[in-house]
Amino acid sequence: MWQRGVIAIIFAALTIWLGYFVEQEQFLAIIAGYAPFFLLYLFVYVRTEKAALHFWLGVGVFLRIILLFSFPNLSDDIYRFVWDGHLINHGFNPFDHLPGYYIENDVLPGVLTPELYNLLNSKEYYTVYPPVLQAIFAVSTWLFPQSIAASGVAMKSFLLLGEIGSIWLIGQLLMHFKLPAKNALLYALNPLVIVEVTGNIHFEGLMIFFLLLAFWWLRSSTPKMHIGSALAMAGSIASKLLPLMFLPFLIKKMRWRSVRYFTIIGVALLLLFAPLLNGLFFNNFGASLDLYFRRFEFNASLFYILEWIYLVVFNEDYVNLFLGPALAFVAFFAIIALVVWRRASWRALPTSWLFAVSIYLLCTTTVHPWYLCLPVALSVFTNWRY
């Protein structure tokens, strides 16, 4: 018992180190925090017996609570969250204009300042955050209009609730599929998930909660549960667009029942997006997505290999203008092939989804660390590990 206590204290110390003291540019300090964190995480997973499972799940929740009041030093996305939230609260649609528009035309709402504008990491593109996130931004900045840090705490509160829900749902789904209960620790104690979701305010955590909730209700044969599942799936898509890639697998499994399911998702998404829809929305949102596939390059895998080969052979430097979209098409058709090839069963669905998101991550031009939170969550129901 005392060993558990010591390890839990070390977990807490490493969480505090990564959440409160390390800055984004301090690479060695980040590695110094993550390396022992992951080693202990693996040790706990391998050694944990059933009797200690609830203790470690509680530790996972506690570590997230520790990060509730930290400022997200490892990510500067919070400034765009706050920017969008204030725009909504002052009657502006965040999808209408680039941030520079408000500076150039001197129409900044009172709480938005040139100083905040200079902190944005995304001045050159329109916002890409779907309506569920925009609502959270608006509520958080409405509660604390004068404080970025306090608005961040409010956003983290939503994520914390989602993470607690995800841990519970993972436990229920593992029990339902008669899988090892300690697999829940693969998500609950994962250092990357803890630090990037609750610590650095990345809403993959909320997307995962809604996706797990949709899956939990979907495996029921009750029509009411299927309605709830469709609404939860809409919430997941309206948090991050990524779960759209999972829908074709449901068509194969549900067959004619998918018509009603997809209709509910479509209506729910229309209602969620309705407050933001206007003549500019599709053009501006599409422009940002196009920019993502054509211009952004970070931690890519297949893209970097093909780019290097192209540059060696053709000695031209505009490869990213077409290679990114080309890989997106490759990913699309690979996922469709996966839908056709994989057997349709609720038990096999998480593995199919895991393969699909793995194909996406292999082909995309940008892979931030927090993108791995989704495959980590899905892998707990499979024999594969991230």
Model-based region annotation:
Residues K50-A51, F55, I167-P191, W346:
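Transmembrane-helix signature of polytopic, membrane-embedded enzymes
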Residues K50-K156:
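Intramembrane catalytic core of multi-pass membrane enzymes that act on lipidic substrates
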Residues W56-L63, R255-L277:
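Hydrophobic alpha-helical membrane-interfacial segments at the cytosolic entry of transmembrane helices
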Residues G165-L169, L206-S221, V357:
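Specific aromatic-rich, kink-prone transmembrane helix
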Residues I194-V197, L213-W217, M225-I251, F355-L362:
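Membrane-interface alpha helices of multi-pass inner-membrane proteins
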